[in-house]
């Protein structure tokens, strides 16, 4: 096992990784920007290094600086967390070349799955169903219009290198396509350095269901059941739960086997998530594969009793998976909500100083955060400031527990999306387990315009 690990990330996920490392007696090294001096991940780590100014391009994305710190601190592994450099093949390759273990899959797999077009091709070759769409890059808006007519509107125009809902737009006709193409291409180039676009037939009112997989270096691949992430705003997840209320035993078996098949097809190693859309007839379509730990990993931990960060470390250290497929538990129900520093109606960011931060306590309540009273939420990073996770024997009990916890959750000094979360869990469509990705648009009193 590793002796010292650098966490190439910030905020709650860095705190989460540090916690497991401490459990395994692994020393930890944190990195931080000038804006994160007071973040809990800096305080919890054994060592912490200032790496730059607040903008991520001047701190958390500086590969050379992070590797210099890693060498200076004498670490033998780097955990990338999620976001930032977690799915950056160049970073993973630089770690390997520096003789430092990268806690994740190989650079080649990250690169392959980082291109949605390449991922589609790989899955089709493996016999994993994909959404009908273009299998090569779109040359221009006229080709996009031609193919959209071929597949039939509405379609989703997507950036091949995209993620987090950026560079993705629902298009309903030729006029919208011509308006959307150049803007999406420009946005994708700005965010990802790659303006390659493709399109897929839009799946109307689908469920967004993903499967957690784990693969070691000894040929073993397992899935750890599914998560339902259908509650989204601007194509970004807000509420996640496991298991999915929509998935019956037959579908659970089918989607789990498909996820394992997908992982084996690309010789995957470590933890990953196979994301799918499932329509009303329970047809499954591969969407993408995330080659990292997910924000919503705690709900899987709650229903299995498995520490997923520990599994990442074990696999990266060359050990075998602790469980075979038939040994992985599935007990109870868990729901996670993301607490965002944002206006609950417009979704615009709400930076500011946290003046009060009081968390609910009790059985089946879990928190992940890196903030505290006096902490300044800045506009430099993702607005998620905390996660609230509840678990119970049944979904109904979990919803009740979540409702009580949200009533007791106190955070002052910034606006948060807690009022919106209360709307979600109190809505009869959500309570009935019938929510699709159109839930927020169709059922909540929100303005779904983009952030300025």
Swiss-Prot record:
Q: Which residues hold Mn(2+) 1? A: 275, 288
Q: Provide the catalytic activity annotation.
A: N(6)-biotinyl-L-lysyl-[protein] + hydrogencarbonate + ATP = N(6)-carboxybiotinyl-L-lysyl-[protein] + ADP + phosphate + H(+)
The residues listed in the UniProt record as binding Mg(2+) 2, with positions renumbered to this chain, are 288, 290
Which parts of the sequence bind Mg(2+) 1?
275, 288
The residues that the entry says bind Mn(2+) 2 are 288, 290
- Which residues does the annotation say bind biotin? 338
Keywords tagged on the record? ATP-binding, Biotin, Fatty acid biosynthesis, Fatty acid metabolism, Ligase, Lipid biosynthesis, Lipid metabolism, Magnesium, Manganese, Metal-binding, Nucleotide-binding
Task: Locate the active site.
Answer: 292
**What metabolic or biological pathway is this protein involved in?**
Lipid metabolism; malonyl-CoA biosynthesis; malonyl-CoA from acetyl-CoA: step 1/1
A Gene Ontology molecular function term for this protein is: metal ion binding
The residues listed in the UniProt record as binding hydrogencarbonate, with positions renumbered to this chain, are 237, 292, 295, 338
Function according to Swiss-Prot or TrEMBL: This protein is a component of the acetyl coenzyme A carboxylase complex; first, biotin carboxylase catalyzes the carboxylation of the carrier protein and then the transcarboxylase transfers the carboxyl group to form malonyl-CoA.
Q: Which NCBIfam families match?
A: PRK08591.1 (NF006367)
Subunit text: Acetyl-CoA carboxylase is a heterohexamer of biotin carboxyl carrier protein, biotin carboxylase and the two subunits of carboxyl transferase in a 2:2 complex.
Q: State what protein this is by name.
A: Biotin carboxylase
The species this protein belongs to is Halalkalibacterium halodurans (strain ATCC BAA-125 / DSM 18197 / FERM 7344 / JCM 9153 / C-125) (Bacillus halodurans)
